[in-house]
Amino acid sequence: MSGKPNERPFSDIITSIRYWVIHSITIPSLFIAGWLFVSTGLAYDIFGAPRPNEYFTEDRQDAPLITDRFNALEQVKQLSQQ
């Protein structure tokens, strides 16, 4: 017997029908929700990350790197205007 007296062993949990009924619904649902979150662009909007087609512009074809840590805000403004 493992753990505290009132704990069920993990082997009992993963071999139960109830576990698989619940998880056969929740695991695919989480996968689909994550896929929709990224594919609709909502993840980019919420976290402020540039979309894959916004990393490089017509004028700037090199990677937008911040090189001066003390003037980082100015560099970000300059890179976002290009």
From Swiss-Prot:
The answer to whether UniProt assigns keyword Endoplasmic reticulum to this entry is: no
GO cellular component, as recorded: chloroplast thylakoid membrane; photosystem II reaction center
Q: Which spans are transmembrane here? A: 21-35
PROSITE patterns given in the database record: CYTOCHROME_B559
Report which superkingdom the organism of origin falls in.
Eukaryota
Q: What does this protein do?
A: This b-type cytochrome is tightly associated with the reaction center of photosystem II (PSII). PSII is a light-driven water:plastoquinone oxidoreductase that uses light energy to abstract electrons from H(2)O, generating O(2) and a proton gradient subsequently used for ATP formation. It consists of a core antenna complex that captures photons, and an electron transfer chain that converts photonic excitation into a charge separation.
| Subunit-structure text | Heterodimer of an alpha subunit and a beta subunit. PSII is composed of 1 copy each of membrane proteins PsbA, PsbB, PsbC, PsbD, PsbE, PsbF, PsbH, PsbI, PsbJ, PsbK, PsbL, PsbM, PsbT, PsbX, PsbY, PsbZ, Psb30/Ycf12, at least 3 peripheral proteins of the oxygen-evolving complex and a large number of cofactors. It forms dimeric complexes.
What is this protein's name? Answer: Cytochrome b559 subunit alpha
Q: Native species of this protein? A: Stigeoclonium helveticum (Green alga)
Taxonomic classification: Eukaryota, Viridiplantae, Chlorophyta, core chlorophytes, Chlorophyceae
